[in-house]
Protein backbone atom coordinates (compact mmCIF):
# COMPACT_ATOMS: atom_id res chain seq x y z
CA UNK A 1 0.00 0.00 0.00
CA UNK A 2 1.34 3.44 -0.96
CA UNK A 3 0.21 7.01 -0.49
CA UNK A 4 -0.69 7.25 -4.17
CA UNK A 5 -2.95 4.18 -4.35
CA UNK A 6 -6.72 4.69 -4.60
CA UNK A 7 -8.90 4.03 -1.57
CA UNK A 8 -12.60 4.05 -0.72
CA UNK A 9 -13.93 6.24 2.07
CA UNK A 10 -17.45 4.92 2.53
CA UNK A 11 -19.14 5.54 -0.81
CA UNK A 12 -16.44 7.96 -1.97
CA UNK A 13 -13.70 6.68 -4.27
CA UNK A 14 -10.47 8.65 -3.71
CA UNK A 15 -7.76 8.64 -6.37
CA UNK A 16 -5.06 8.61 -3.67
CA UNK A 17 -4.67 8.74 0.10
CA UNK A 18 -3.69 12.40 0.35
CA UNK A 19 -6.17 14.57 2.27
CA UNK A 20 -5.93 18.34 2.22
CA UNK A 21 -6.85 19.53 5.70
CA UNK A 22 -9.12 22.56 6.17
CA UNK A 23 -7.39 25.94 6.24
CA UNK A 24 -9.35 29.10 6.98
CA UNK A 25 -8.15 31.69 4.51
CA UNK A 26 -10.37 34.75 5.19
CA UNK A 27 -10.76 35.49 1.49
CA UNK A 28 -14.52 35.32 1.07
CA UNK A 29 -16.25 38.07 -0.88
CA UNK A 30 -18.18 41.02 0.51
CA UNK A 31 -21.22 38.83 1.23
CA UNK A 32 -19.15 35.94 2.61
CA UNK A 33 -19.41 34.04 -0.67
CA UNK A 34 -16.59 32.06 -2.27
CA UNK A 35 -14.99 34.13 -5.04
CA UNK A 36 -13.28 33.14 -8.27
CA UNK A 37 -10.06 33.04 -6.24
CA UNK A 38 -11.70 30.37 -4.06
CA UNK A 39 -12.78 28.37 -7.12
CA UNK A 40 -9.24 28.50 -8.51
CA UNK A 41 -7.64 27.68 -5.14
CA UNK A 42 -9.60 24.46 -4.66
CA UNK A 43 -9.43 23.47 -8.35
CA UNK A 44 -5.63 23.72 -8.23
CA UNK A 45 -5.61 21.25 -5.35
CA UNK A 46 -8.05 18.73 -6.84
CA UNK A 47 -5.28 16.17 -7.36
CA UNK A 48 -5.31 15.50 -3.61
CA UNK A 49 -7.39 12.42 -2.85
CA UNK A 50 -9.76 14.53 -0.79
CA UNK A 51 -10.11 18.25 -0.10
CA UNK A 52 -11.73 19.47 3.11
CA UNK A 53 -12.81 23.09 2.74
CA UNK A 54 -12.07 25.89 5.12
CA UNK A 55 -14.61 26.27 7.93
CA UNK A 56 -18.00 27.36 6.57
CA UNK A 57 -20.56 28.88 8.91
CA UNK A 58 -24.04 27.28 8.94
CA UNK A 59 -25.86 30.43 10.11
CA UNK A 60 -25.04 34.09 10.64
CA UNK A 61 -24.99 33.43 14.40
CA UNK A 62 -22.25 30.86 13.71
CA UNK A 63 -19.91 33.31 11.99
CA UNK A 64 -16.87 34.37 13.97
CA UNK A 65 -14.06 35.57 11.75
CA UNK A 66 -13.87 38.29 9.12
CA UNK A 67 -14.21 37.27 5.47
CA UNK A 68 -15.05 33.63 6.15
CA UNK A 69 -17.59 31.93 3.90
CA UNK A 70 -21.07 30.78 4.78
CA UNK A 71 -23.64 28.46 3.25
CA UNK A 72 -26.69 30.53 4.19
CA UNK A 73 -27.62 32.84 1.30
CA UNK A 74 -28.48 31.92 -2.27
CA UNK A 75 -25.35 33.79 -3.41
CA UNK A 76 -23.13 31.74 -1.09
CA UNK A 77 -24.74 28.46 -2.15
CA UNK A 78 -24.36 29.27 -5.86
CA UNK A 79 -20.70 30.18 -5.36
CA UNK A 80 -19.97 26.93 -3.49
CA UNK A 81 -21.64 25.03 -6.31
CA UNK A 82 -19.06 26.53 -8.70
CA UNK A 83 -16.28 25.32 -6.39
CA UNK A 84 -17.72 21.78 -6.38
CA UNK A 85 -18.15 21.75 -10.14
CA UNK A 86 -14.56 22.85 -10.78
CA UNK A 87 -13.06 20.35 -8.31
CA UNK A 88 -15.12 17.52 -9.83
CA UNK A 89 -14.22 18.69 -13.34
CA UNK A 90 -10.58 18.21 -12.28
CA UNK A 91 -11.39 14.68 -11.00
CA UNK A 92 -11.21 15.67 -7.33
CA UNK A 93 -13.38 15.03 -4.28
CA UNK A 94 -14.39 17.73 -1.82
CA UNK A 95 -16.02 17.76 1.62
CA UNK A 96 -17.39 20.90 3.29
CA UNK A 97 -16.30 21.60 6.85
CA UNK A 98 -19.17 23.19 8.78
CA UNK A 99 -17.91 25.42 11.59
CA UNK A 100 -20.00 27.32 14.16
CA UNK A 101 -17.62 29.56 16.13
CA UNK A 102 -19.85 30.01 19.18
CA UNK A 103 -18.14 32.38 21.62
CA UNK A 104 -15.06 32.82 19.41
CA UNK A 105 -16.56 35.80 17.60
CA UNK A 106 -16.74 39.56 17.25
CA UNK A 107 -19.98 41.40 16.51
CA UNK A 108 -18.17 43.57 13.95
CA UNK A 109 -17.65 40.45 11.81
CA UNK A 110 -21.35 39.49 11.79
CA UNK A 111 -24.48 40.95 10.20
CA UNK A 112 -26.35 43.29 12.55
CA UNK A 113 -29.07 40.73 13.32
CA UNK A 114 -26.64 37.94 14.25
CA UNK A 115 -25.87 37.00 17.84
CA UNK A 116 -22.82 35.48 19.50
CA UNK A 117 -24.15 32.35 21.21
CA UNK A 118 -22.51 29.81 23.50
CA UNK A 119 -23.47 27.29 26.19
CA UNK A 120 -22.63 29.86 28.89
CA UNK A 121 -21.82 33.57 29.16
CA UNK A 122 -18.12 32.86 29.63
CA UNK A 123 -15.96 35.34 27.73
CA UNK A 124 -13.15 33.89 25.60
CA UNK A 125 -9.72 35.33 26.31
CA UNK A 126 -7.89 36.92 23.43
CA UNK A 127 -8.67 39.17 20.51
CA UNK A 128 -9.97 38.79 16.99
CA UNK A 129 -9.33 40.85 13.86
CA UNK A 130 -12.15 42.89 12.34
CA UNK A 131 -12.02 44.98 9.16
CA UNK A 132 -13.78 47.89 10.88
CA UNK A 133 -12.02 48.10 14.25
CA UNK A 134 -8.79 46.11 13.93
CA UNK A 135 -8.13 43.79 16.86
CA UNK A 136 -11.02 43.59 19.36
CA UNK A 137 -11.89 41.45 22.37
CA UNK A 138 -14.13 38.47 21.70
CA UNK A 139 -17.80 39.14 22.42
CA UNK A 140 -19.32 38.08 25.71
CA UNK A 141 -21.70 35.43 24.38
CA UNK A 142 -25.38 35.07 25.09
CA UNK A 143 -26.25 31.83 26.87
CA UNK A 144 -28.12 29.59 24.46
CA UNK A 145 -31.71 28.72 25.27
CA UNK A 146 -33.19 25.34 24.42
CA UNK A 147 -34.77 27.01 21.39
CA UNK A 148 -31.35 28.37 20.33
CA UNK A 149 -29.86 24.89 20.66
CA UNK A 150 -32.64 23.35 18.57
CA UNK A 151 -32.25 26.08 15.94
CA UNK A 152 -28.49 25.57 15.81
CA UNK A 153 -28.91 21.82 15.33
CA UNK A 154 -31.33 22.59 12.50
CA UNK A 155 -28.84 25.09 11.04
CA UNK A 156 -26.15 22.38 10.94
CA UNK A 157 -28.56 19.91 9.30
CA UNK A 158 -29.73 22.49 6.77
CA UNK A 159 -26.16 23.49 5.91
CA UNK A 160 -25.17 19.84 5.46
CA UNK A 161 -28.15 19.18 3.19
CA UNK A 162 -27.41 22.29 1.12
CA UNK A 163 -23.79 21.12 0.71
CA UNK A 164 -24.83 17.66 -0.47
CA UNK A 165 -27.52 19.11 -2.76
CA UNK A 166 -25.00 21.28 -4.62
CA UNK A 167 -22.50 18.49 -5.13
CA UNK A 168 -20.21 18.17 -2.13
CA UNK A 169 -19.04 14.61 -1.60
CA UNK A 170 -19.65 14.87 2.14
CA UNK A 171 -19.54 17.16 5.15
CA UNK A 172 -17.31 17.38 8.20
CA UNK A 173 -18.43 19.02 11.44
CA UNK A 174 -15.71 21.08 13.10
CA UNK A 175 -16.10 19.99 16.72
CA UNK A 176 -12.71 20.88 18.20
CA UNK A 177 -10.36 23.84 18.73
CA UNK A 178 -12.72 25.66 21.08
CA UNK A 179 -15.63 26.14 18.67
CA UNK A 180 -19.29 25.59 19.57
CA UNK A 181 -19.47 21.77 19.86
CA UNK A 182 -16.27 21.75 21.95
CA UNK A 183 -17.67 24.58 24.09
CA UNK A 184 -20.54 22.32 25.12
CA UNK A 185 -18.12 19.53 26.10
CA UNK A 186 -15.72 21.61 28.19
CA UNK A 187 -16.21 22.51 31.85
CA UNK A 188 -14.24 25.68 31.13
CA UNK A 189 -16.91 26.96 28.76
CA UNK A 190 -20.08 25.21 29.93
Where would I find each of the regions flagged by the language model?
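Catalytic domains of carbohydrate-active enzymes, especially glycoside hydrolases
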Residues: 38-58, 165-170
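Polysaccharide-binding and catalytic clefts of secreted carbohydrate-active enzymes
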Residues: 140-144, 172-190
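Short, acidic/polar
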Residues: 33-45, 151-161
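Active-site beta-loop-alpha junctions enriched in small/polar residues
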Residues: 23-26, 56, 99-101, 176-178
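Non-globular sequence segments
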Residues: 93, 99-166
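Acidic/aromatic-lined carbohydrate-recognition and catalytic surfaces
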Residues: 17, 55-112, 146, 187
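Hydrophobic faces of well-ordered beta-strands that scaffold small-molecule active sites
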Residues: 5, 18-21, 51-53, 94-98, ...
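Conserved, mostly hydrophobic/aromatic
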Residues: 20, 45, 87, 96, ...
Amino acid sequence: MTLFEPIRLGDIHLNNRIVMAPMTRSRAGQNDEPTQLTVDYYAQRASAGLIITEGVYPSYDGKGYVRTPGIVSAEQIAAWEKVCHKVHENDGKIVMQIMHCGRIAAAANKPDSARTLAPSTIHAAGKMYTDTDGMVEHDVPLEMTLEDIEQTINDYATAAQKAINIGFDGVELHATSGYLPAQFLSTGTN
